[in-house]
């Protein structure tokens, strides 16, 4: 009985010495973390957000404390800045609470900040060193907020979440290109990583516009990358300017046996202000300037050099189809016999969108195009199932009010 009583006294004493971190009167806080990585090469990376809600005017924050004890390597971090967010939680950078240039297990930002009645937003940003490892994680928690009403420990809405480290491969304005979009990533036979994308030189918009297909390459598992360079560029073909010779939507597949890399893209010639998916932006038949064209570039040396552009429209597109184009994204290789399978899309004779696949059993020397799935769909991805069939996951536009996914399994007969 004495031991139990003594234990109770010690426990009561210990807890009486700890500061109370339940919500201070009239103030409570939430911690939120997004499910996306912090990127090497970016000036700001959102690693944690705080919503501090005051029930009335007159309260203020004195300090905010952040713990990084679960972070794999603190020296991956170059600096951290705490910002005051916008009224709706926008990640604004107009007002900085403070910056820490030396990583540590615990950071305390001491500054008096008057709280308005209602929600007050804060977000912690980190800038990563160029040497930060892609295998590492950042583990951050706002462990304490000191206010004029007392101490608060924010409620964590995503407990246990860690932030992965990534690499900002292409950023808006990099190399003079306005926007990079439509990425496709694959691994070459020598282990190199290859990233393909639209290089949208003038603006964000789709075709018709000055767009080339670009490439960045990594030979160290994605830790560093080469600068973007175009591999599919029509220039001023046919005497028309580059903004009437746009190439977009890369689709890529690597033959694991030969190492050949095939990249397809859709090319529009002329038709300024039009889009291949709308109206007469593309037309039936094969005529350049009327029908959007399917182009192919091939590399035999792991993406170092590329063939001249090949126009394969007549080889693949049915004449009555309005459009035939890459899905885009990645193809797959069937495990049983090495068949190459590439998801593709298009518009049928009535102009309605469709999805299907094309396949090659001779390492890309020739390709067989499947029939449209029958679903009103477009962009799609393929995966091989255990029985060797191919499941096609498609963006469906059957219900115009709500975009949905549609799934169809194609048997070996279709391949």
Task: Label the predicted regions.
Residues 24-164:
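Exposed, polar/acidic Ser/Thr-rich sequence context and nearby capping/turn residues
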Residues 9, 63-65, 183:
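Short, solvent-exposed linear motifs at loop/edge-of-secondary-structure regions
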């Amino acid at each position: 009985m004495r031991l139990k009583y003594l234990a109770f006294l010690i426990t009561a004493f210990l807890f009486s010495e700890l500061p109370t971190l339940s919500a201070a009167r009239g103030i409570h806080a939430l911690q939120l973390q997004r499910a996306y990585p912090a990127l090497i090469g970016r000036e700001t990376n959102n690693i944690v957000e705080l919503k501090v809600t005051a029930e009335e005017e007159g309260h203020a924050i004195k300090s905010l404390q952040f713990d990084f004890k679960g972070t794999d390597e603190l020296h991956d971090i170059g600096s951290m800045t705490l910002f005051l967010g916008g009224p709706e939680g926008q990640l604004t950078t107009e007002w900085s609470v403070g910056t820490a240039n030396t990583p540590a297990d615990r950071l305390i930002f001491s500054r008096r900040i008057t709280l308005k009645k209602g929600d007050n937003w804060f977000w912690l940003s980190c800038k990563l060193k160029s040497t930060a490892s892609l295998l590492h994680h950042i583990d951050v928690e706002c462990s304490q907020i000191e206010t004029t009403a007392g101490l608060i420990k924010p409620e964590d809405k995503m407990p246990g979440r860690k932030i992965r480290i990534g690499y900002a491969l292409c950023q808006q304005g990099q190399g003079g290109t306005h926007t990079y979009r439509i990425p496709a990533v694959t691994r070459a036979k020598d282990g190199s990583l290859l990233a393909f994308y639209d290089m949208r030189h003038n603006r964000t918009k789709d075709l018709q516009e000055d767009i080339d297909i670009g490439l960045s390459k990594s030979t160290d598992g994605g830790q560093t990358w080469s600068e973007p360079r175009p591999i599919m560029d029509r220039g001023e073909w046919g005497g028309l300017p580059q903004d009437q010779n746009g190439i977009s939507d890369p689709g890529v597949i690597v033959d694991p046996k030969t190492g050949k890399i095939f990249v397809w893209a859709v090319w529009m010639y002329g038709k300024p202000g039009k889009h291949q998916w709308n109206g007469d932006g593309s037309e039936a038949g094969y005529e350049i300037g009327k029908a959007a064209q399917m182009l192919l570039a091939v590399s035999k040396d792991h993406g170092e050099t590329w063939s001249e552009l090949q126009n394969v429209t007549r080889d693949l597109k049915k004449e009555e189809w309005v459009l035939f184009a890459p899905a885009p994204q990645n193809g797959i290789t069937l495990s049983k016999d090495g068949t190459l399978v590439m998801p593709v899309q298009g518009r049928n004779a009535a102009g309605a969108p469709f999805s299907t696949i094309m396949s090659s059993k001779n390492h890309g020397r020739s390709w067989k195009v499947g029939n449209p799935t029958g679903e009103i769909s477009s962009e799609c991805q393929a995966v091989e199932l255990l029985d060797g069939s191919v499941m096609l996951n498609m963006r469906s536009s059957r219900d115009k009010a709500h975009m949905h996914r549609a799934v169809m399994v194609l048997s070996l007969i279709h391949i």
